Every structure is written in structure tokens, then in C-alpha cells.
A protein has these predicted regions:
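Glycine-rich adenosine-cofactor-binding loop
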Residues: 1-22, 35-38
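Short, aromatic/basic amphipathic alpha-helical patches
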Residues: 15, 43-54, 119-126
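Conserved S-adenosyl-L-methionine
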Residues: 15-30, 125-133
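NAD(P)-binding Rossmann-fold cofactor-contacting core
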Residues: 20-60
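Rossmann-like NAD(P)-binding element
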Residues: 31-33, 37-40, 59-96
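Rossmann-fold NAD(P)-binding glycine/threonine-rich loop
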Residues: 88-164
């Protein structure tokens, strides 16, 4: 299962999974999308209906972090939990409480790469017990500009390995 919060990044990730489903790629058994506002869920439903979305999806209204916790605790083991809310980056906080029970052997992904990152801190604190893998948005952030620079300047920029790690360190110092 793959829960996500509705919004631009959430819709982009969901559409990418739809594309993979259409081409026979590896996709989750289902997706759970939560949002604090019904209007956000309705907007996502309309967009997905328009393309004939190919993956089972549940839209859940979760106006509080406790409501989001309920969506996460219901997930099966090995699920991926994504924070695409902007909480921790655009404004303080996390969509979940510190008491959230994460899926065993699951994966968390915080789209944000700077700011408070409370979601990453919560997942990291829980990572030892349920064998949770925690990812922040830094590598994703670096990949986007690196691909554009490579295309514009017709240069080869590796997307992993020592050279990529060196570029990442330079970017960290430039943004600090």
C-alpha cells in the first residue's frame, strides 16, 4: 500500500504510478490518499477519474494528525508512507503525531529537503523498532536540477556514486 497526502506532489507521484501500471511496471496493491480538506480530495478524484486511474485508491479525509495516524496504522507491513504536505518545509509540523505506528519493514519518504522536517525526525525515531527505512527529499531535490543542467549544457552528470555524492555535498554547503 502507498499512502500519500493530496496536493501537487502527491498527484504527480500517483500519476507516475498510473503510468507504470499502464506499462506493466511494478506498482503498489493500492493507494491511500489523505487530506485535511475534502476539496483537495475531490480535486484529486476528478483528475484521476479523467485519466481512468488504474490502481485501487482510497481517499480519506484526515483533518488532524490523529486522523492521518489512523490511515498509517491500518497499512500492511512493507507499505510506503509519503509526506507531500509541505508540513515541515512550508510551515511547521508533521501530518502525523509522534505516537504514530509505522508499518513494519516499511519505507518513509519526505518530499521536503529543508526546514523543520518533523516527519523525518518522527520516522527516524521509530526506524529501529519496525525496521523502517527513512528517506528525505534531498536526493530527489538534487536529481531535478542535475538532469536539467546535464541537458542544457550537454554534459554527463552521474545520478549516483562518488561524483553525485560530491555534487550533493557542494549543494548542501551552498544552501546552508
Amino acid at each position: 500500500m502507498h499512502p500519500s497526502r493530496s496536493g501537487g506532489l502527491s498527484l504527480a507521484l500517483t500519476l507516475d504510478m498510473h503510468k507504470k501500471a499502464r506499462s506493466g511496471g511494478d506498482i503498489p496493491q493500492g493507494i491511500v490518499v489523505t487530506a485535511r480538506r475534502e476539496a483537495s480530495l475531490a480535486e484529486m478524484r476528478r483528475a484521476l477519474r479523467a485519466i481512468g486511474f488504474a490502481i485501487p485508491i482510497e481517499h480519506r479525509l484526515a483533518p488532524t494528525p490523529v486522523g492521518s495516524d489512523a490511515a498509517v496504522v491500518a497499512l500492511p507491513d512493507t507499505s510506503e508512507v509519503v509526506n507531500a504536505t509541505g508540513l515541515g518545509k512550508d510551515r511547521p509540523g508533521s501530518p502525523l503525531t509522534d505516537a504514530c505506528h509505522w508499518p513494519a519493514r516499511g519505507l518513509t519518504w519526505e518530499f521536503s529537503y529543508h526546514g523543520e522536517l518533523a516527519f523525518v525526525d518522527q520516522a527516524s525515531a521509530a526506524a529501529a523498532a519496525p525496521s523502517l527505512t527513512v528517506h528525505d527529499g534531498w536526493v530527489c531535490f538534487i536529481h531535478g536540477p542535475a538532469r536539467v543542467i546535464a541537458k542544457v549544457f550537454d554534459v554527463d552528470i552521474p545520478m549516483s556514486g562518488p561524483a553525485f555524492d560530491a555534487l550533493s555535498r557542494i549543494a548542501i554547503h551552498a544552501t546552508s
